[in-house]
């Protein structure tokens, strides 16, 4: 149905000049050229001493070795207590080594994961142990908005439940 003179069909002709490489060498280069997936894996393995710092979450390292199709099939799950503890220990280890500035360390909330009375937490000494223990008790207004509740009504319903439970 389509004619050869159709405007949709574009044909290119390459002039036969002196080629820079013979066809076999060009084919070898094409075969050796890495795919984007292998580039990601080789760049991560290039310096093993920096590899741990480049990927802060040790739980993500096994997923990097998987193909994109395998990664797509994986479902994202919440971390278990053991995994969460491992992430907190890794974060605290980085803080002790001084890799993270003090201002950024206080903003992460990692100090709250330590039990009250543990020396070395600056936030606890300023706020007192009762302030850090009460902080996670009520959800943030943003979390309440995500669930469709208004922050003011959710707070009063929690207060009334707490009063009736006492």
Swiss-Prot record:
Residues 153-166 have a biased composition (Polar residues). Residues 1-166 are annotated as: Disordered. The modification N-acetylmethionine is found at residue 1. It holds the Pfam family DARPP-32. Belongs to the protein phosphatase inhibitor 1 family. Interacts with PPP1R15A. This is Protein phosphatase 1 regulatory subunit 1A. It comes from Oryctolagus cuniculus (Rabbit). The lineage of its organism: Eukaryota, Metazoa, Chordata, Craniata, Vertebrata. The gene is PPP1R1A.
């Amino acid at each position: 149905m389509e004619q050869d003179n159709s405007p949709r069909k574009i044909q290119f002709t390459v002039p036969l000049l002196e080629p820079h490489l013979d066809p076999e060498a060009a084919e070898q280069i094409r075969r050796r050229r890495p795919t984007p997936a292998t580039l990601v894996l080789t760049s991560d393995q290039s310096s093993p001493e920096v590899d741990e710092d480049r990927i802060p979450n040790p739980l993500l390292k096994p997923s990097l070795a998987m193909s994109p199709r395998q990664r797509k099939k994986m479902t994202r799950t919440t971390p278990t207590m053991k995994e969460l503890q491992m992430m907190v220990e890794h974060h605290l280890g980085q803080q002790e080594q001084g890799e993270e500035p003090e201002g950024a360390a206080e903003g992460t909330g990692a100090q709250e994961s330590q039990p009250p009375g543990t020396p070395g937490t600056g936030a606890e000494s300023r706020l007192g142990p009762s302030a850090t223990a009460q902080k996670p008790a009520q959800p943030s207004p943003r979390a309440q908005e995500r669930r469709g509740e208004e922050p003011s009504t959710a707070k009063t319903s929690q207060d009334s439940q707490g009063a009736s439970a006492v």
